């Protein structure tokens, strides 16, 4: 019997995908190892067709503002150029009035969402309690803007509050939800492989804790996004391991009939220009390699698309041109206007920190695809 050529294996695999089958992890790794231009073309075409089957041609965007309320942080992640010690030059901590003013400006500019995250500042307490401080952040925004969608606090921040105050994750998430947090960013995931985390973010929560906090949020009715920090030291096998964990967690939320689940997947390629030197040296470049990011984007659509239908590139990381190209590699959303974003821009990203609605619309229209403004949870506006 003739051994099938790589292209026959690839063709058969992609045909099965288009029939609605899920890839095995081994098949996902196989796709990430394809570098022949012809193979890349068929992988791209398959991801684009799947996107069309799963969510249609309309490309969505959200009008939002990022508020990074402090960069004072007790941790020292090897990819982070944002963090500062309290007494370091460049350290900042926004007051409640400043946060309210930024929110008001955003609403005037049509924002429907505030995305709020910050460093892990041990001094951020009210009456000696971390949770009280975070609830005051929520209350500051929600009292004045009760209908604004608040997308706030990563699993790492939830763990930090729980640790500081001796609470369970469920207690923290329930309190934040009841105060007005509408959804949580699935950041701090980086790569969900502890071997990688021990190098790039040894002080961060481990994989099991990230998964537990996200699953708890879903069970308590708080939707989350999912993310992956790619293109630093992780291997294709580890990238797929990460995607497999996300897929399994989404399947669990559906099987257990949890009231919430992942709303989207966002790929975040590593930007090292101003990041700490040791990881920069190890990675050996300062800006993402677009082709690597596009292949992983396509494979993420193929691997996750049956379970997480909305896929978004990061224009902050890739630039708007790179993110627009990702829309033909399996993505169906262009993300938010952001209005400001400190974490990636301080690492040296060249994508900018603010995009007008017109910028995003023009980028989408350049592909002859229709566009629609959406809510955080992917309802059309």
From Swiss-Prot:
KW Repeat (keyword) present: no
A GO molecular-function descriptor: 5-amino-6-(D-ribitylamino)uracil--L-tyrosine 4-hydroxyphenyl transferase activity
EC category: transferase
Cofactor(s) required, per the database record: [4Fe-4S] cluster
Xref: InterPro entries: Aldolase_TIM, CofH/MnqC-like_C, CofH_family, F420, FO_synthase_su2, rSAM
Domain Radical SAM core: 59-306
Enzyme Commission designation: 2.5.1.147
Record flagged with keyword Iron-sulfur: yes
Keywords for the protein's UniProt record, in alphabetical order: 4Fe-4S, Iron, Iron-sulfur, Metal-binding, S-adenosyl-L-methionine, Transferase
NCBIfam families: CofH family radical SAM protein (TIGR00423), F420_cofH (TIGR03551), PRK07360.1 (NF005609)
Protein's recorded name: 5-amino-6-(D-ribitylamino)uracil--L-tyrosine 4-hydroxyphenyl transferase
